[in-house]
Design a protein with these regions (language model features):
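C-terminal/domain-edge helix-coil "capping" segments
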Residues: 19-41, 47-50, 113-117, 132, ...
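Extracytoplasmic/secreted cell-surface and envelope-processing proteins
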Residues: 132-138
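Outer-membrane beta-barrel domain signature
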Residues: 100, 140-142
Length: 225
């Protein structure tokens, strides 16, 4: 049984200590049920601009531009499987408002989008980390060669611009000796960044407050990139 949020609920999962630990945080606004949301739109996700360190090569590379589309598509695919929730995909949002991004500028723009698409809320997101695995599925030379994913998402009401739910995630896959449960859950292998992103979205959406999650048949997968 899913736990309903009666107060702003903060959910922290995974080991928090040590470099490369997995962190997941979701917050649900206590008044979300008052909005009676049954139809939402997934906006095209933004990609965080490179930091000075990334531009100079001192830090991990900035996420590639395509990572925004990949994460937005993953969220759409998984949310669209839920009962009791209709979801408008990012391409339809772009077609309706070509200039819109994940960072909506004003309430009037939100209301306009809501009227055009007949949605009560939008899901917007930003990709901060999207690093591909360097090496094979069976072994890496260095721990930092593992795939890494980090993103934040928000569900925003088009009526008043209030944030009704947020989700944040970061993970650099750790070796078997540090993350036995992760390997048991996802298989004894080092994941590609797309596989890690797929798992990350599943974990964040465990606490998504709208719709009912349908148990997928064994072997069902997300669409290929």
């Amino acid at each position: 049984m899913r736990t309903r949020a009666l107060v702003p609920a903060v959910v922290l999962m995974g080991a928090m200590a040590g470099c490369g630990a997995t962190t997941t945080e979701t917050i649900t606004a206590p008044q979300i049920e008052q909005y009676r949301i049954v139809r939402i739109a997934v906006l095209p996700f933004m990609v965080a601009p490179p930091t000075p360190g990334q531009r100079r090569g001192y830090a991990a590379p900035a996420p590639p531009a395509v990572s925004g589309d990949k994460l937005a598509d993953l969220f759409y695919f998984k949310l669209n499987l839920r009962e009791g929730l209709a979801v408008v995909p990012p391409p339809m949002v772009r077609e309706t408002m070509p200039s819109i991004t994940a960072s909506v500028a004003s309430r009037s723009l939100l209301r306009d989008l809501g009227e055009r698409l007949d949605v009560a809320a939008v899901l917007e997101g930003t990709v901060e980390v999207y690093q591909e695995r360097k090496g094979s599925a069976i072994g890496l030379e260095r721990a930092e060669d593992a795939a890494a994913v980090g993103f934040s998402v928000r569900l925003v009401s088009v009526k008043d611009g209030k944030t009704l739910w947020t989700g944040e995630y970061y993970e650099r896959q750790r070796p078997l000796t540090e993350d036995l449960s992760g390997f048991l859950e996802r298989g004894v292998r080092f994941l590609t960044v797309e596989q890690l992103a797929n798992s990350a979205v599943d974990k964040v959406l465990r606490e998504f407050p709208l719709g009912r999650q349908i148990q997928r048949m064994q072997g069902a997968t997300s669409p290929s990139p």
